[in-house]
Amino acid sequence: LIDIQNFAWEGFGSSGNSRVRPLRIECVSAGSGRAIRFFFRDSDKNEIRVARLLKDGLRSDVGEEYVTEIQVNTSEALPVPFIFAALRKSGGMHWDLGDQAVFSGQIDVSNVEGYWTAECSGTMKQVDLAVTTALLSAHLQGVAEITLNNFLWSQSRIKNVDCECIADRGEIEQVWIDRLVRILGCRVDEAYHHLSGSHARSFQRLGFGLVIDSGGLQLLALPGRSGCLLESQGLPVILEPLQTVTLDRLAWLLSGTRPPAVPGTDVTAWLLSVLPIPNAFR
């Protein structure tokens, strides 16, 4: 049992205004194994738990076989870098969302026979779009809120993503808009003006739903927005595509080359390796 009277998470470049709270770390029994719990003493219902369990509670002839489980269950916002630190053992690629990003919701991760599975639902707030797009060839600026209705990972691949993203103000490079129109089939509306190069335009609202599964990619406007994905000065800039597109077009969108080439970058190479296997190849 470890009690830390004053704990605050401050990432590199953070403002230093993190709430200071008492943190408890304890080792507890968990079925056929042990678990380490991380929780704030003033709110013990919100916790991060890392467990190592004997598979099926049995020992085999070749020795003990273990299952690793990582669980996050929190109704209050916890720093995303803090959660990523707990998930580091899973070996996944953790995309930088900024030092101020926070998460509330549920995450369940497990490893059986070397394969990781994960399921997640919840909300991420204060996502720094400049940091999030820093590894890409084109960039965004602003602060976003992302709602994960469902994220499912199995057998080293994404199985399903269903999420929504909203940013009330920011800047978007024109090349993003051009690619969304050319590659994903978004439609141009009255506030669209073609600007050259990487010139950025300000926006008052960016909002979309994204669904990824073996059937392809759907980019959707949010309810009540009349199909609009991006607004500038109160006018629609681009509208949602009329149909689902193939998953390789997501890699094209992020590749940053013209004509689009894949993998193009390390990011898109990784993405292609983990996207769902299309129904046509099953």
Mark where each language-model region is:
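Membrane-proximal interfacial segments on either side of biological membranes
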Residues: 1-45, 50-282
